[in-house]
Amino acid sequence: MTPAIYLVKGRDKSLRRKHPWVFSRGISKVEGTPKLGETVDVYSFEGKWLAKAAYSPHSQITARVWSFEQEPIDRDFFIKRIEQAQLLRNDIIERDGLTGYRLIAAESDGLPGITIDKYQDYLVCQLLSAGAEYQKQTLVEALLHCFPECHIYERSDVAVRKKEGLDERVGVLHGELPPKSVVIEENGVKISVDIVGGHKTGFYLDQRDSRFQSMKYVKEKEVLNCFSYTGGFGLYALKGGAKRVINADVSQPALDTAKFNAELNGFDISKKRAVFLNADVFKLLREYRDQGTRFDVVVMDPPKFAESKAQLDGACRGYKDINMLAMQILNPGGTLLTYSCSGLMDQVLFQKIIADAALDAGRDVKFVERFEQAADHPTDTAYPEGFYLKGFACKVL
């Protein structure tokens, strides 16, 4: 008999709207002794069947819904979800000429806690939930059915797994260990990805659309690319005809890859055109401000400042300070391209932070364009939490 959980009276409303999470405070009782990650049936307080979900007793999100249909959660289920996700992305892949893209965007693709990025013939899995870990072998079998020629590598080296009672894991799940450099292409730009040692699963695929849209602002401009990582925005700036691009990052290996990427695309990397600067961005911006160094375009794409609600106030201060500094080093009429990947910070709050930064910088600033995550990172209508990346193009007068 399948284990089951019963909800507190009245706590079934979100599930009836197809939201995929059940919180611990919403559960009245558990029937049976489900294992960590095992599939359970979810019932309302009155005993009406609602969903099949993965059980995670250590997490505040105690159950994550696999399906709102009475169906087995087996190999065929995962094959169906993967095929649906691939079909959703086929037009995007053709349009943007992609050899690297997000195949599975967790809850938004009906596979909670599972993120899968495809880089050429390498599928890179990040399994964030107990249910994802429990179904790992079944998931691998389904992936091999859909992509029989692919190697599969796990990058579940993320702290959030501890909340699920899981250890961090990395390693080969099928095939060969990825090489140090796997070259992908997007919008005609070649990018070297370090799957094993890079950030996230190797690269920030979610910023692809923003990178492409940034090109309209950079022609014949002096561009400062902050938190450049392996140079994504810098590559598009060079492609878009920027006069000069300074890529600033605290990681020398990332800067080395950024330089390699520029060479890979045949761009001029003389110091007159491209600079790769190892620096703390906060300190660098203050130095530029105090020295009177100015730019036409500043790209501000920092790492996530808020991992929890307790960190949100500090994150707000950090975002405000860094955007204020960016505004202070822009020439009149310059463009600030600024982004936040903190899911806890919604677009309204981020917009207010930019407004506060403008006041502190003493600059008149206009929002002229809004950005969000790339199209292969969809957001399900029932899961607004899937919308996490937001950005603005601002004219600084």
Curated annotation (Swiss-Prot):
Subcellular location per the Swiss-Prot or TrEMBL entry: Cytoplasm
InterPro entries: PUA (IPR002478), PUA-like_sf (IPR015947), PUA_sf (IPR036974), RLMI (IPR023542), RlmI-like_PUA (IPR041532), SAM-dep_methyl-trfase (IPR019614), SAM-dependent_MTases_sf (IPR029063)
Record keywords, A-Z: Cytoplasm, Methyltransferase, RNA-binding, rRNA processing, S-adenosyl-L-methionine, Transferase
The enzyme's E.C. designation: 2.1.1.191
Catalytic activity annotation: cytidine(1962) in 23S rRNA + S-adenosyl-L-methionine = 5-methylcytidine(1962) in 23S rRNA + S-adenosyl-L-homocysteine + H(+)
Main location: cytoplasm
Enzyme class: transferase
A GO CC annotation given for this chain: cytoplasm
Span of domain PUA: 2-78
Single annotated GO MF: RNA binding
UniProt similarity note: Belongs to the methyltransferase superfamily. RlmI family.
UniProt cross-references to PANTHER family, sorted A to Z: RIBOSOMAL RNA LARGE SUBUNIT METHYLTRANSFERASE (PTHR42873), S-ADENOSYLMETHIONINE-DEPENDENT METHYLTRANSFERASE DOMAIN-CONTAINING PROTEIN (PTHR42873:SF1)
Function per UniProt: Specifically methylates the cytosine at position 1962 (m5C1962) of 23S rRNA.
Protein name per the record: Ribosomal RNA large subunit methyltransferase I
